[in-house]
Amino acid sequence: MDELIMMVFVLFTIVLLLTVSMTLAALISTIVVLVVPLIICIIALLIALRIKYGSKKDLSEVSIGFFHPYCTAGGGGERVLWCAIKSIQEEYPYVRCVVYTGDKESDDEIFNKVKKTFDIELGRDNLEFIRLKKRKWVEASTYPRFTLIGQSLGSMILGWEALTKFVPTIFLDSMGYAFTFPIFSLIGGSTVACYVHYPTISSDMISSVKSSSYSFNNDVSISSNKFKTISKLIYYNIFSKIYQIVGSFSKLVMVNGTWTGNHIRDIWKKQFGYDLFIVYPPVDVKGRKQLKLGWMDGTRKNMILSIAQFRPEKNHQLQLRTLAHLLEKYPSHREQPLNTKLVLVGGVRDQADRDRVEQLRNLSKELNIEDHVEFQIGISSDQLNQLLSEASVGIHTMYNEHFGIGVVELMAAGVIPVANNSAGPKEDIVRHEDTGFLASTIQEYAEYIHEILAYREKYVEMQKKARDSTDRFSESNFSNQFLKYIKPLINQSLRNNNSSSKKRN
């Protein structure tokens, strides 16, 4: 009887395995029947599009298409764009530069704004602007949810529009739209390069979600909900893999600093010194260094200066709480001769930013420090220079800021920085206790600020060292480094064009 039961069980198992195998085989066959033709169609479509748009590339010239949809924004990213173009114009006057932009200003208005904002005089003979009408697809406001993937897919729509209007020899993305890379590489046949200010996604972002930590890109509604946390973690990991794939299409990657470089190396699997290079962004070091040092002659006031847009990640609350702690622990800062003041300088983009400023004003009242706090919104360059010439301490509180142009400007102007002990300021800009200070907590910030203001004579040398250390962030240094790494691509393009011309002849 036992043998019969065993035989029935074995036969049942065999039948079950055969049934499962046949089902799987049928499923695989169905997938093959459906997927293989689809893959063939996609490949055929790519080849057809490559023939159509690749043939539009003018082989009689070398052109560089700069993908920068917001070229008139007037920030650090735009200084990178215009300095890069200026460098190309001076070194390769015969190379055609094209800027893909969604801005509606006329050419003259853009040229004039670049001159007024950055004091950069661009040549007009070999620079043109191609207007893009689909910029709304990369605006964060278009995607209240799934912003990362939404903007990334949206950039492909914008990139397609750009490709259909002009196919460059070299495509250079300078705003972080990596999903445009395969479009220009596979279909346009362009050599892809990029300048990365910060990775679209990083291991820090994933770790923040994994640990359920609250941050500006991981709000309480997600960090406090396990299901949402797991869902977002899956979303981030999938996006990270796709980001790695599109990043592989770039033959040259320039990054603004060590922190960004390390993350891009890990995500895109690039190699420092081979296809990944650090090129510090250009900062108006020359202009800031013209300001008088005036450390001991009374020119510098007991002013703490903050330069940062009023965005949540800039963490202005920490600055106010630092001042409150300073005034509480060292009451002498409330009175003459110290009478220490915090001046917050920054721009506002929208109503949310304006509301944030109002919240900060209310916080200063709650902390009983409103008489020692001043807000300067959207001030002129001359007004900023005046503040830079009067301030003694600069405060920077953003965690993991990819670089920190504001910190460099402070140092060049003769303002001793107390910056956040993370990312760009820590790895590339401030040498702790040599050219400034690095802090993480309210207590650390307050102690360093007190030390600088109360014992001013000890920091004469630090002020000079801080200013001298900013030479590596000058426009001329950026130009030299940028040309060093873009030259091989331009020279290779010239050789390819010459070879194609000979074949046609």
Swiss-Prot record:
GO CC terms: endoplasmic reticulum membrane; lipid droplet
Major enzyme class: transferase
Transmembrane segments: 4-24
InterPro entries to which the protein is assigned, alphabetical: ALG11 (IPR038013), ALG11_N (IPR031814), Glyco_trans_1 (IPR001296)
Key words, A-Z: Endoplasmic reticulum, Glycosyltransferase, Membrane, Transferase, Transmembrane, Transmembrane helix
Topology, Cytoplasmic side: 25-145, 167-402, 424-505
Taxonomic superkingdom: Eukaryota
Topological region Lumenal: 1-3
Catalytic activity: an alpha-D-Man-(1->3)-[alpha-D-Man-(1->6)]-beta-D-Man-(1->4)-beta-D-GlcNAc-(1->4)-alpha-D-GlcNAc-diphospho-di-trans,poly-cis-dolichol + 2 GDP-alpha-D-mannose = an alpha-D-Man-(1->2)-alpha-D-Man-(1->2)-alpha-D-Man-(1->3)-[alpha-D-Man-(1->6)]-beta-D-Man-(1->4)-beta-D-GlcNAc-(1->4)-alpha-D-GlcNAc-diphospho-di-trans,poly-cis-dolichol + 2 GDP + 2 H(+)
CDD domains: GT4_ALG11-like
Protein's UniProt keywords contain Cytoplasm: no
Pfam families recorded: ALG11_N (PF15924), Glycos_transf_1 (PF00534)
GO molecular function (one): GDP-Man:Man3GlcNAc2-PP-Dol alpha-1,2-mannosyltransferase activity
Intramembrane segments: 146-166, 403-423
Membrane-topology descriptor: Single-pass membrane protein
Keyword Transmembrane: yes
Pathway where this protein functions: Protein modification; protein glycosylation
EC nos: 2.4.1.131
Single biological process term from Gene Ontology: protein glycosylation
Main subcellular location of this protein, as a coarse class: endoplasmic reticulum
Location(s), subcellular: Endoplasmic reticulum membrane
Role summary: GDP-Man:Man(3)GlcNAc(2)-PP-Dol alpha-1,2-mannosyltransferase that operates in the biosynthetic pathway of dolichol-linked oligosaccharides, the glycan precursors employed in protein asparagine (N)-glycosylation. The assembly of dolichol-linked oligosaccharides begins on the cytosolic side of the endoplasmic reticulum membrane and finishes in its lumen. The sequential addition of sugars to dolichol pyrophosphate produces dolichol-linked oligosaccharides containing fourteen sugars, including two GlcNAcs, nine mannoses and three glucoses.
Record PANTHER family: GDP-MAN:MAN(3)GLCNAC(2)-PP-DOL ALPHA-1,2-MANNOSYLTRANSFERASE
Family: Belongs to the glycosyltransferase group 1 family.
Name by which UniProt lists this protein: GDP-Man:Man(3)GlcNAc(2)-PP-Dol alpha-1,2-mannosyltransferase
Species assigned in the record: Dictyostelium discoideum
